[in-house]
């Protein structure tokens, strides 16, 4: 009976502590949004979450075409893909015996899994990105590249090593062989991630719409 009473005595304090923690986090998010003059401009950065489809998509298609028709067949790209344990489109099983260009149109190939794997293994140097996706890679996949680098920071911040690795594994046999810290992050890139993280904390506490600190 004494133990039960002690347990009940602890519950109100726990609830109060949780409420204080949530309140503190809300205040912190609000203060960061209001005191950081760069937060508003960062959160309004159109390049991070939105693109002009008419201007961006032709460049993206160029990158897909380069990857499917040319770079995936080069020894350099094949060796990197083997090292980071990800199959190229030409290495994936197909139900059709027709050539890749006929059986799997380039428009059906997603570049995002390759960008993600290059980032988490720190193989995403400009030289490698150009080797995979062509000279137009910054205009074509640059926005995806920025998104996924921030996503990697978020994943590492919100979970441990095993969970982070699992998030980037591709079933059944293309597991991420290793994880490396983000390659050469700039101060601006870190500030963008910090602002986005504060925005996410606000979302967790329903500080959106009229309640948003920004």
UniProtKB/Swiss-Prot annotation:
<dbReference type="InterPro" id="IPR053267">
    <property type="entry name" value="Verrucosidin_biosynth-assoc"/>
</dbReference>
<comment type="pathway">
    <text>Secondary metabolite biosynthesis; terpenoid biosynthesis.</text>
</comment>
<feature type="compositionally biased region" description="Basic and acidic residues">
    <location>
        <begin position="18"/>
        <end position="33"/>
    </location>
</feature>
<comment type="function">
    <text>Part of the gene cluster that mediates the biosynthesis of the neurotoxin verrucosidin, a methylated alpha-pyrone polyketide that inhibits oxidative phosphorylation in mitochondria and thereby causes neurological diseases. The carbon backbone of verrucosidin is synthesized by the HR-PKS verA, and further modified by the other verrucodidin cluster enzymes.</text>
</comment>
<feature type="region of interest" description="Disordered">
    <location>
        <begin position="18"/>
        <end position="45"/>
    </location>
</feature>
<comment type="pathway">
    <text>Mycotoxin biosynthesis.</text>
</comment>
<protein>
    <recommendedName>
        <fullName>Verrucosidin biosynthesis cluster protein U3</fullName>
    </recommendedName>
</protein>
<dbReference type="GO" id="GO:0016114">
    <property type="term" value="P:terpenoid biosynthetic process"/>
</dbReference>
